[in-house]
Amino acid sequence: WRGKTIVNLSRAFLDTNGAHQEADVTLEVPNRQGNLFEKTEVADVKGKWLDMLSDLNVCSQKGLVERFDGSIGAGSVFMPYGGKYQLTETQAMVAKLPVLKGRTDTVTMMSYGFDPELSSWSPYHGAVYAVVSSVAKIVAAGGDYSRIRFTFQEYFRRMNENPSRWSQPFSALLGAY
């Protein structure tokens, strides 16, 4: 601050959250029932199609997106919808980095890849596909895969001393790795 160091903590200390922690893990294998990778036969294709369109993970979110102004600030590169009729959802956020003077062509890109149905069945498979999906979206938007940096947001039930409780975050970390 004003040329003086106020706090100087090592990165190694910050990575531990201040204390060494260990936990036992009992790994839970996903059920064979509900396996999303198994081929299923559908008798009523039209009914299944309409059912899929009503799924919150598939249906249009245009009404929600229109509540936000994507043109605020001069940094936005992609609008929320693109294409000839402005109806195609963009799969990545791209914004120029702010600079004090002059122009910049440097951007930051962000995407996502979470599949709640797959992750509910298997946190491991959900994490694998989350990484692959988010990388594919960045590359499709013009990003360089070798410069991608990851951040993972995780939401698991409260952990305690029960080793089976640690199965979900442990499996997800293995999948993301």
Locations of the language-model features?
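Glycine/proline-enriched, intrinsically flexible loops and inter-domain linkers
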Residues: 1-177
